[in-house]
Amino acid sequence: MKWLLLLGLVALSECIIYKVPLVRKKSLRRNLSEHGLLKDFLKKHNRNPASKYFPQTEAPTLIDEQPLENYLDVEYFGTIGIGTPAQDFTVIFDTGSSNLWVPSVYCSSLACTNHNLFNPQDSSTYQSTSGTLSITYGTGSMTGILGYDTVQVGGISDTNQIFGLSETEPGSFLYYAPFDGILGLAYPSISSSGATPVFDNIWDQGLVSQDLFSVYLSADDQSGSVVIFGGIDSSYYTGSLNWVPVSVEGYWQISVDSITMNGEAIACAEGCQAIVDTGTSLLTGPTSPIANIQSDIGASENSDGEMVVSCSAISSLPDIVFTINGVQYPLPPSAYILQSQGSCTSGFQGMDVPTESGELWILGDVFIRQYFTVFDRANNQVGLAPVA
């Protein structure tokens, strides 16, 4: 009996998963708007989120282009700890990038005065390097140094993790950002500075039993969202997971069969490529078909550059259906029209990302809120199921 109990405990330990709660906060866009800075931000920063996916690197091992407007609408954030003892930071868990960086005490920029700062001298496990990091944000750069330390993620102690410590951060806009830094969860092939991404380091150390992680984004205004490392929790979805092969290993890129409304193709009629990206809030696609979708749902641009929609349209508009690997994934109007403080905006955004296989679509939080998503590195596939 004791042996059976021991075997049961061993089996249970092999299935342990680690959850990082995500909190939903005001986006950077809303913070800037409330402080009367949104128009100035949009004027100074070129609205080109596409450069996130095709960085122009001056030195491939050191520099990455990462336009700040990618994170303008992100609302989901989690807490990690870096160092011994741990220093806490609020980060975006971003499947559309691969690096980890946080502000540091070496940063004198205005943005750093309003965020948590990592102090290497307060960590007994910090190891310095001679490496540097520079990430371009529109009109300025986040520059910093690279170091190694222990990162605490949802109960996991990720030792010897390389990360960036910012020394300068661009403009006054980041002062209002609801996050301190970024934790990238894409493939190592797109990591700047040759840095090993956090999840890869966790897996290489045998800290999780399965080479995958999963994401649930709640529509609730405050809590319930989670990133799960090393496993899948079926309580977050209904039915069974449908698996989609990763078509290009870099971002979490998959093939989409078609996008339809009322049974008619409105985009991607002959198939297209898409990236599943927790670090992009909206659902983006090529400017021409997105313009047609905006017209179909009655969206028009306001003075802040937002595509506004009548809130009453939510009850009458049809679903927009994404067919992926032969399975239909409908988005109801309550998902693709975003309601906030009595006004409504479109969850779609035009963005041209040309590739050899055609223009890319980005399935951001608008899509992920509807579908529990598994990012399976072992089998290079994405799992999707309707949220519970």
From Swiss-Prot:
PROSITE patterns: ASP_PROTEASE, PEPTIDASE_A1
An example Gene Ontology biological process: proteolysis
A Pfam family hit: Asp
Keywords tagged on the record: Aspartyl protease, Digestion, Disulfide bond, Hydrolase, Phosphoprotein, Protease, Secreted, Signal, Zymogen
One MF annotation (Gene Ontology) recorded for this entry: aspartic-type endopeptidase activity
Gene3D superfamilies in the record: 6.10.140.60, Acid Proteases
Annotated disulfide bonds: 107-112, 268-272, 311-344
Major place of residence: secreted
Phosphoserine: residues bearing it: 130
Catalytic center residues: 94, 277
Signal peptide feature range: 1-15
Residues of the Peptidase A1 domain: 76-385
GO CC term (a single one): extracellular region
Reaction(s) this enzyme catalyzes, per UniProt: Preferential cleavage: hydrophobic, preferably aromatic, residues in P1 and P1' positions. Cleaves 1-Phe-|-Val-2, 4-Gln-|-His-5, 13-Glu-|-Ala-14, 14-Ala-|-Leu-15, 15-Leu-|-Tyr-16, 16-Tyr-|-Leu-17, 23-Gly-|-Phe-24, 24-Phe-|-Phe-25 and 25-Phe-|-Tyr-26 bonds in the B chain of insulin
EC numbers for this chain: 3.4.23.1
Propeptide: 16-62
Localization terms from the record: Secreted
Family: Belongs to the peptidase A1 family.
Main function: Shows particularly broad specificity; although bonds involving phenylalanine and leucine are preferred, many others are also cleaved to some extent.
Official protein name in the record: Pepsin A
Originating organism: Macaca mulatta
Higher taxonomy: Eukaryota, Metazoa, Chordata, Craniata, Vertebrata
